[in-house]
Amino acid sequence: MKIITDSGADLSFEDCQQIGVTMVPLKVEVDGVSYQAGVDIDTEHFYDLMDASPVMPITSTPSIGDFAEVYQKFADEGEEILSIHISSGLSGTFNVAKQAAEMVKNARIHLIDTLTLSAGQAWQVTAAAKMQQAGKSLDEIIAKLGQIQAATTTHFTLPDLKYLIAGGRISHLRGLLASMLGIKPVIEVSKE
């Protein structure tokens, strides 16, 4: 069995290699320069570039072809595939992976919508890899991922509100008032 994920898990390419997971990276464009998240730009560098750029970065999902190529490679090797992805409520990545899976006819692909991102997604990917290395069956791994999903709530705090304002998540006025009062929101990732 092969485990595949995307860079929404905040695992580097090297992290994935160490645990035997294949990563299909999301794409990020900052100031006209394109990067593959987790491959040629890490989270810290991304935030540094964001802080220095007057323009909001553009993120995009991997292409259907990116996933189909990886799926086809492992299908041709006779591998069953467990593909674990960033929440479908936060990104189109899961749906792109699903479309790619439907294109690869000779593959046995099991798609998991983690219902989260970042550390919550990384936890699921890492747990699946450890269970695989321990010789657990695919059914056992999928059941455990369901338990982890049920037990996981992902929260974030932000040092300031400028990205929420720029991204239209909160109004400029509310952002200005919250900033003046020193309010730093705690954001919970919804499982819906």
Question: For each predicted feature, which ranges?
Answer:
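Glycine-rich, highly charged phosphate/nucleotide-binding loops
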Residues: S60-V70
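N-terminal glycine-rich anion-binding loop in soluble enzyme alpha/beta folds
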Residues: K2-T61
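Glycine-rich phosphate-binding loop signature in dinucleotide/nucleotide-binding domains
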Residues: F74-I81
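Mixed-charge interfacial surface used for oligomerization/domain docking
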Residues: K2, S12-C16, V21-T22, K27, ...
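A general structural signal for well-ordered alpha-helical segments in protein cores
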Residues: T43-F46, F67, A97, V125
